[in-house]
A protein has these predicted regions:
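Active-site-proximal helix-loop-helix substrate-binding element of RNase H-like nuclease domains
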Residues: 19, 60-207, 217, 221-225, ...
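Long, highly charged low-complexity segments
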Residues: 1-62, 76-99
Length: 241
């Protein structure tokens, strides 16, 4: 049913006039970021980690986008070789926790359920999830791929910095924690920026029924799945016997 409801063609999202991806690795820069968060109503959000298994993943960094082309990256778990200067993870999370847990600051991302698990590993319950580019893509174009690389090509007309180009593949693949901080900043900032742009773009093409399905079914179900994955489910053994 979703595929039948897709629009005939989607135009590319407009490109921002400038691109500003900023590294946050000093206390002064962090203070400026907190001031920006105080004034923000919505952000693009992404986490960089050590594993695709969200339950086991450790934070390497957090990126946030405030507007198209405007994003920051906070390295938290890079190796000293990759990032000689970075802020203390516990200190940063302590400052960010009220914003991440606030339901008044809306968060948009790409498969945010993963990031929700990662942050929960550190005692942070991500609230205010209002958009997910992956789920928006499923509503509009269920027959196509929903990965961020594909979405960026399709809707922004842009190639992304691929994970493999930074970390390699196979036996020689390195951890994201070992990626040079300049490269990591661009990669992570792109993730938050592109997710923010793509989600807003796709939402413009949703009709009333699709928007209702997106906001009242897909996003709430993702939260239910998070709870189920986190806590497990009870099984009636007698009923199954």
């Amino acid at each position: 049913a979703l595929a039948n409801a897709q629009p005939a063609a989607l135009t590319l999202a407009p490109a921002p006039d400038t691109i500003n991806y900023q590294l946050i690795n000093t206390e002064a820069q962090l203070a400026e970021l907190l001031t920006r968060l105080d004034a923000a109503t919505a952000i693009g959000l992404d986490t960089e980690t050590t594993s695709l298994d969200a339950m086991q993943a450790q934070l390497v960094g957090i990126s946030m986008a405030f507007a198209p082309g405007d994003a920051v990256y906070i390295p938290l778990g890079h190796t000293l070789t990759a990032a000689p200067e970075q802020l203390d993870l516990d200190d940063v999370l302590g400052y960010l926790k009220p914003y991440l847990e606030s339901d008044k600051l809306y968060k948009i991302g790409q498969n945010l359920k993963y990031d929700e698990h990662v942050l929960f590993n550190y005692g942070i319950k991500l609230n205010g999830i209002s958009g997910d580019a992956m789920l928006a893509s499923y509503i509009i174009e269920s027959h196509l791929g929903h990965g961020l690389d594909e979405l960026a090509e399709r809707h922004l007309g842009l190639p992304t910095v691929s994970y493999e180009s930074l970390c390699g593949k196979g036996a020689k693949q390195i951890s994201f924690a070992a990626v040079a901080i300049e490269d990591a900043t661009r990669y992570a900032s792109e993730d938050a920026d592109f997710a923010l742009r793509i989600e807003a773009h796709l939402k413009q093409y949703m009709d009333t029924k699709q928007l209702e399905m997106y906001q009242q079914l897909e996003l709430p179900v993702a939260e239910i799945l998070f709870i189920m994955e986190r806590n497990g489910v009870l099984i009636d053994k007698q009923e199954l016997a």
